[in-house]
Amino acid sequence: MAGRRLNLRWALSVLCVLLMAETVSGTRGSSTGAHISPQFPASGVNQTPVVDCRKVCGLNVSDRCDFIRTNPDCHSDGGYLDYLEGIFCHFPPSLLPLAVTLYVSWLLYLFLILGVTAAKFFCPNLSAISTTLKLSHNVAGVTFLAFGNGAPDIFSALVAFSDPHTAGLALGALFGAGVLVTTVVAGGITILHPFMAASRPFFRDIVFYMVAVFLTFLMLFRGRVTLAWALGYLGLYVFYVVTVILCTWIYQRQRRGSLFCPMPVTPEILSDSEEDRVSSNTNSYDYGDEYRPLFFYQETTAQILVRALNPLDYMKWRRKSAYWKALKVFKLPVEFLLLLTVPVVDPDKDDQNWKRPLNCLHLVISPLVVVLTLQSGTYGVYEIGGLVPVWVVVVIAGTALASVTFFATSDSQPPRLHWLFAFLGFLTSALWINAAATEVVNILRSLGVVFRLSNTVLGLTLLAWGNSIGDAFSDFTLARQGYPRMAFSACFGGIIFNILVGVGLGCLLQISRSHTEVKLEPDGLLVWVLAGALGLSLVFSLVSVPLQCFQLSRVYGFCLLLFYLNFLVVALLTEFGVIHLKSM
């Protein structure tokens, strides 16, 4: 069952990519005017067409609000809240620490939203779609599961790349996550459980990742990304997928006839802590088993709805630790909202998680969420013929469809087209993730303005840590459970997808919208320090692992951790100008 669930959640990465293209391009394109205030120069401010927004803190307190509202560099295209205006126009200077504290708290909660949505709603629906499409393990493994696990990273990169002001944030996050995963996570795995690495998958993944990093280094050196380069990134990932499939096919042929049965999914093709995702999906939102009553009786429609919307397992609550309970309290509002708006299909259950009253309610609420989150709600409030908003039409159509479905189905038997709810759930959860990722990017940029930090350093620290912490714990759990090779392989498989698809698709969306090449303006020396550190960490592993005869010890793990600490110190010293070059 675990093997099946492991490979179920990956379908529709291509469809999701198309969704991302529409979602992100729309998010940036439609709301440009929404955040631009009247175009009058601020009193007492020497206004220029574009001034670095980080200079706002050097102005008089009375001029800061006007500067934020009139300076194009301070406008965040997309998102629902204007965080910079909130700090400088609605909080007095004496309450700036309070504003920053609230923003950081909201940022942490957004990371929680990203994790819950991806793990418990987005990935399970990908699993159901993969089962419906009958995809092979290999194809699903290196594409759709990688996308499902890396959804927060990919969405954050797409949102950041779609705005020239935050492109550095995307590069910092992708490079920063790469350094973090290949040093801290990989090192932690070997410290927890020394093991013998698989030579061929190791060489394959690290070489592909080094090529991706080198291409990104060249892209930064050129300072621009053309359509050919963007397509080249995506093409390289396709080539990687083909290589993995061929390597796995050759590996299985060599093992054919052996006394040992091959694994359904070999460690060679695992990506980004899959096994933990399986465990997560198996244990989370198993609605039927969690809330199954001791005595079977015919439940009413209201009882089915209440049980389906209950995100809390009371038996599990009683036996869990205080830490788990505290975290669950914060998750409950998010889980309830997602249960209400996102359908989840589970092919492994007899009823496929069919809950008639809730699923019929989804036919009304989910499309409404789609139109209100797509392009930051621009589509939803658009008035057809200047009379009726789109969201009203969606509610009417959804209500009619829900009524037909409710009276044409039963509580005990899922309908023949129930699998279509997986596509609806996938679309809705993807848009929830995109909305949260947009807010994350906007908050980080606002904090960068307040503290005069570059987008790159915010990306390599806060954004990289926030998006990678879940996978880090997942891989550490795998290592403790005796699967260090699987976890180590996941370190490289997932980040290859993130950098190639994140950069390639993000730049492709920007090019398709603006019809010009993407201009990149590296944040000084720091970007080169980041790229160099990632390259050095890969070279270190490429040289040291074969020298150890692929027997990875705790010494190797501690060396990787020491490397990351040194990198972090150098990066921060570079950001604050302690380390600098005269030519920079």
UniProtKB/Swiss-Prot annotation:
Disulfide bonding pattern of the chain: none
PTM-bearing positions, type Phosphoserine: S258
Membrane topology, record value: Multi-pass membrane protein
Localization in the cell: Mitochondrion inner membrane
Keyword Ribonucleoprotein: no
Regions crossing the membrane: 96-116, 141-161, 169-189, 201-221, 227-247, 326-346, 361-381, 384-404, 417-437, 446-466, 488-508, 525-545, 559-579
Cytoplasmic side: 117-140, 190-200, 248-325, 382-383, 438-445, 509-524, 580-584
Carbohydrate attachment residues: N60
Regulation: Inhibited by the sodium/calcium exchanger inhibitor CGP-37157. Strongly inhibited by zinc.
Effect of D153A: Lithium-selective; displays markedly reduced calcium:sodium antiporter activity while retaining almost normal calcium:lithium antiporter activity
Modification comment: Phosphorylation at Ser-258 by PKA prevents calcium overload.
Keyword Glycoprotein carried by entry: yes
UniProt superkingdom: Eukaryota
Tissue specificity of this protein: Present in pancreatic beta-cells (at protein level).
Result when mutating D471A: Sodium-selective; has little effect on calcium:sodium antiporter activity while displaying markedly reduced calcium:lithium antiporter activity
Pfam assignment, any one: Na_Ca_ex
GO MF assignments: calcium:monoatomic cation antiporter activity; calcium:sodium antiporter activity; calcium:sodium antiporter activity involved in regulation of cardiac muscle cell membrane potential; protein homodimerization activity
Biological role: Mitochondrial sodium/calcium antiporter that mediates sodium-dependent calcium efflux from mitochondrion, by mediating the exchange of 3 sodium ions per 1 calcium ion. Plays a central role in mitochondrial calcium homeostasis by mediating mitochondrial calcium extrusion: calcium efflux is essential for mitochondrial function and cell survival, notably in cardiomyocytes.
Protein name: Mitochondrial sodium/calcium exchanger protein
Organism: Homo sapiens
